[in-house]
Amino acid sequence: MKKNELVAIACLLCFCCCNETEKEVPNPDLQEELSPIQFTIDLQKEVLPFPVTKSIPELNIPEPIPQNPDAEEDPSTPDIDPDNLYNRIDYIVYQSGKPDILVKHKQFTPQDPDFTIIYDSLPSGDYHICFLAHSDKNISVSGQTALFSKVSDTFHLFLTQEVQTGERIIKDITLQRIVGKIEFISADAVSKALKSFTINVSNYQNKIDLTTGNGISQNTPYTQTDTFNDSDIGKTNFSHSFFTFIPAPEFMLKAHLSAKNQINEVTREREVNDILPLINHIIRYTGILYTPKESDDTFTLDILNDGKWDSPIDKDLKD
């Protein structure tokens, strides 16, 4: 299927230091030999288009069904730009145990030499290592959980690694996308009177279990407001979107949508319930977002898959 994957090749090389953000617990045995390791992060893609499915009642979102592999791909879907997927790499090392003990936490940015290449050295032992690629400047790691100030496109891997003194380690590892994207597309045009569009989300998923990459529900609210300018007047198909980690099925999201005019009067409100994000997919809603309601209309739900955020699954919803 369509996937964006981050591929890291770990091999034995000379140890180099980067000017990254680093938290490290000193090793009490300073005489123990260290084994230098290098992780190089890259991007890979696979493609699987999805069919159009219509007239699904209410907001019941089914699992996507793979399309005939001979079907044509949506030509409007742009290629992925790897430079825009992430600008932070977190490298978190735990000494394996019951419980695991945090050994070090390093964060790399594009300002570091050889960004996407992680140099490290570890003494012999058993380790759990977590990799996160994302764009949040304010990530907070506590134990084996991570809290994000705002969820961005995020890729993850948690692996078990044995390190032996003098051992040569060459290993391919793959980071998987662990977020879904919720997107609202306007079917109506931006009017001169329109000022802003706000999304209020209940049960926003901005915390994860680092061992699995799964979202941890904690009833967090999230608000996002997009403001229009003069160049937007008359345009349609505006996208308003946010990323989220994947909750357990019993913790679905709810979104309240509201458009306001220049004097801060609400011109349109919509409530979207029971949103269950899908990992590596866009859940796309298309409908009237700004214009005052005059009659009943429908809200079309699209689901797009992964890296290139590909072809939609359409669903009709009643107000």
Regions found by a protein language model. Give the residues of each.
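Tryptophan-paired
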Residues: A71-S140, K195-H281, S311-D319
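C-terminal motif of bacterial Sec signal peptides marking the signal peptidase cleavage site
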Residues: C14-C17
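Acidic, serine/threonine- and glycine-rich low-complexity intrinsically disordered segments
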Residues: Q144-K235
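Beta-strand secondary-structure signal
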Residues: P36-T40, D90, H128-C130, I170-D172, ...
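Sec-dependent signal peptide recognition
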Residues: K2-I9
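Intrinsic-disorder/low-complexity, polar/charged segments enriched in Ser/Thr/Lys/Arg/Asp/Glu/Gln
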Residues: P36-Q38, D114-T116, R168-I170, K181, ...
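Acidic/polar, low-complexity intrinsically disordered N-terminal segments immediately downstream
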Residues: T21-P110, F115-I117, D126, H281-D319
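Extracellular beta-sheet/turn segments enriched in Thr/Pro/Gly and aliphatic residues
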Residues: S149-I178, I185-A187, R270-D319
